[in-house]
């Protein structure tokens, strides 16, 4: 994953593998700071990888940054944050079976889901 400023200058490069779809949601308290949580499907390892975006816009590596799926070939991804009950869900598609899987994030340090 590359990040850029508004003039197109590269700010960061995170060599995480083949990240396919990315989505993010705001206002999480992780590692004692308020951040946005970025999730992306990693096609090399069939998992969901995570990065943190600080309030200053900087993207940081997240030490506990992945969740292994049982999918054969992860592909599409989107997130949903239910503000009524403070739950976050990630929906992932499997390219081979065309199935859609739903995961609920149950903790953030380290990332875990069910």
Question: Model-derived features: where do they sit?
Answer:
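Extracellular cadherin-type adhesion modules in metazoan precursor proteins
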Residues: 1, 90-92, 106-111
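WD40 beta-propeller blade core
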Residues: 2, 49, 99-101
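Blade-loop segments of beta-propeller domains
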Residues: 5-46, 61-65
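Generic structural motif
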Residues: 22, 77, 113-114
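Short loop/turn segments immediately following beta-strands, especially the blade-tip
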Residues: 27-30, 50-60, 83, 103-114
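Short, conserved, GDST-rich strand-edge loop motifs in beta-rich repeat architectures
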Residues: 35-36, 101-103
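Short loop/turn segments immediately following the C-termini of beta-strands
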Residues: 41-43, 93-96, 105
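Asp-box/WD-like beta-propeller blade repeats and closely related beta-sheet repeat scaffolds
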Residues: 46-88, 92-93
């Amino acid at each position: 994953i590359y990040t850029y400023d508004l003039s197109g200058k590269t700010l960061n490069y995170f060599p995480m593998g083949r990240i396919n779809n990315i989505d993010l949601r705001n206002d999480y308290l992780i590692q004692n700071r308020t951040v946005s949580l970025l999730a992306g499907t990693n096609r090399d390892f069939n998992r969901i990888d995570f990065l943190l975006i600080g309030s200053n816009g900087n993207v940081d590596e997240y030490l506990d940054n992945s969740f292994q799926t049982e999918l054969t070939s992860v592909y599409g991804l989107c997130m949903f944050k239910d503000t009524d009950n403070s739950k976050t869900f990630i929906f992932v598609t499997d390219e081979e079976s065309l199935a859609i899987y739903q995961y609920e994030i149950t903790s953030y340090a380290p990332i875990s889901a069910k």
